[in-house]
Amino acid sequence: EKLLVSGGPYEFMQRCPTFGCMAWVIDRQGNVLHSWEVDTDKLFAQIPNLAGKTKPENFYPSGIALTPDGGLVMAIQGRNTYPFQIGLVRIDRNGNVVWKHWNNSHHWIAVAADGTVYAPYREAIDGKTHFGGTAVETRCKANLGAEGIGVYAPDGKLLRRISLLDAVDKSDFSGLLYGLRTGCDP
């Protein structure tokens, strides 16, 4: 059995001495079978719409998944940044960036056998006063934070976005939105 271990910038420097290992695969005896080192200075340069401490060491993979060809897809989070959910990065087996989307994707992702990537995302919705066709007010003075699932082709092309808020709105369970503690974060 093999285990996929997440790392980050400057982690496991014995194995990845320049930038650290973003992830590595080990067997049950602890032998490292493969690792991914990425030039984090290049990877994390010019992330748009991000405030806070944007040094590479403040970014880390919060979700990782292997691709069918031995590459890796990572959901990147930020410490001391706003927003904290940064986006998705696909790297090849050698640690080269294949594609990246700084689109507020976050946490646990999944890669299907055909290479399709499924990743949760967060988006800010401005001007929404009610949830769907209900009488439930959002009570937001600022943007509403909504979640969804992004579906990506193996080449990184966005195929579809599935809004979880819209799915609940259109279901027979839209009344669940009435019990929200804060109307800005369903």
Question: What name fits each language-model region?
Answer:
Residues 1-186:
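Histidine-/acidic-rich catalytic cores in large beta-rich domains
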